[in-house]
Amino acid sequence: ELMNKLMASDYVDYDNAMAVKFQQAILSLPEKQRIVFNLRYYDELDYEEISRITDTRAETLKVNYHYAKEKIKEYMTNN
């Protein structure tokens, strides 16, 4: 029984660990990038909808989303 407890305590849910790391990556983004990333990725809004919500030009949002994706990739690779 002790061995089972020890083995169970060493169990790592890698899917959950990756999800936590992904959330940490998102939280590390500058606010503007984080907002556009969340609205685009999670809420699946198009740039025109996000533009109306944030009062920001769609072109600017596209740039922010691009940089957000790059920073998330970098975070996931290096941390």
Predicted regions and their residues:
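Amphipathic alpha-helical segment used for protein-protein interaction
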Residues: 3-35, 45-53
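DNA-recognition helix of helix-turn-helix
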Residues: 33, 39, 48, 53-79
